[in-house]
Amino acid sequence: MAAAPSESIPSVNKAWVYSEYGKTSDVLKFDPSVAVPEIKEDQVLIKVVAASLNPVDFKRALGYFKDTDSPLPTIPGYDVAGVVVKVGSQVTKFKVGDEVYGDLNETALVNPTRFGSLAEYTAAYERVLAHKPKNLSFIEAASLPLAIETAHEGLERAELSAGKSVLVLGGAGGVGTHIIQLAKHVFGASKVAATASTKKLDLLRTLGAADLAIDYTKENFEDLPEKFDVVYDAVGETDKAVKAVKEGGKVVTIVGPATPPAILFVLTSKGSVLEKLKPYLESGKVKPVLDPTSPYPFTKVVEAFGYLESSRATGKVVVYPIP
């Protein structure tokens, strides 16, 4: 098992932890001396540089899926970007010193790790990680994995292909901004439409991939005469989404419950998807989208969650630097 010099990897580290379910503002506490996780043969230990927050983090803290959650206490954080400091004996893709990023949890809602990314060190399975694109900062890289992989998997499930049209519900969110970009630049959609609130329409336009920006505060997308081959619902409105799809088209959603024939799915995290998207990220065709308030310092994680929970975020909320 290769490692950095043992004296450089401490036995304890700083982390944010909750030991009971509830609102992050009530239950999330800073702990200066949490045990650094031991790695398995197919894992690496990462010195965390940046982490991003996702709605699944605060929903998990609230106990939304406690029946399938790992036992408390929990260090939250799915998305990580950092440097490999130790590798398990079966790891072949990464070595000590590699800059990596990924979504730590292969199955988001079933036994997610208790050692998330809001800590100085975290353990990750080799299969969920990828090498960080050289042109991206750690902040940018940390913003990507869960959101861009979710966008990609949904478009694959919807069978979006070149020449088809797509409508994105919630185009300015962490996932929505990537659905728009991937639909246009990776899947070759002929037309990309997206909904957002009035103040977030400019963001859709700056992405340069949305052909039609719909202000949902002023018009109902389901009443438009134009229908779409694919509707990707990132907000939880499948009852309306199914009215906007062409006959024989596909509706996918990441927010249940799903009105048939919409397909509800939960992401399976794969480093191979990040590797596949690497050329698009390195060329600048697909760009990370950070909320203007990002990054939040490690001391302000509770405030970062409060902002994310307010639904005001446009793009991703990132925590950096992590000591």
From Swiss-Prot:
Quote the record's binding site residues for NADP(+): 59, 174-175, 197-200, 216, 254, 265-267, 312-313
At the top of the EC hierarchy, this enzyme's class is oxidoreductase
Catalytic activity reported: 4-hydroxy-2,5-dimethyl-furan-3(2H)-one + NADP(+) = 4-hydroxy-5-methyl-2-methylenefuran-3(2H)-one + NADPH + H(+)
> How is temperature linked to this protein's activity?
Optimum temperature is 37 degrees Celsius.
MF term (GO), any: furaneol oxidoreductase activity
Tagged with keyword NAD:
yes
- Residues bound to substrate: 59
Q: Which UniProt keywords apply?
A: NAD, NADP, Oxidoreductase
Tissue expression pattern: Expressed in parenchyma tissues of red fruits. Not found in vascular tissues. Also detected in the achenes.
Taxonomic superkingdom = Eukaryota
Acyltransferase in keyword set: no
**What triggers its expression?**
Down-regulated by auxin.
Q: How is it modified after translation?
A: The N-terminus is blocked.
Q: What is its EC number?
A: 1.3.1.105
**Noted pH dependence of activity:** Optimum pH is 7.0.
Q: Its family?
A: Belongs to the zinc-containing alcohol dehydrogenase family. Quinone oxidoreductase subfamily.
Q: What does this protein do?
A: Enone oxidoreductase involved in the biosynthesis of 4-hydroxy-2,5-dimethyl-3(2H)-furanone (HDMF or furaneol), the key flavor compound in strawberries. Can use both NADH and NADPH as the electron donor.
Known partners and oligomeric status: Monomer.
Q: What is this protein called?
A: 2-methylene-furan-3-one reductase
Q: Which species expresses this protein natively? A: Fragaria ananassa
As recorded in Swiss-Prot or TrEMBL, the protein's gene is named: EO
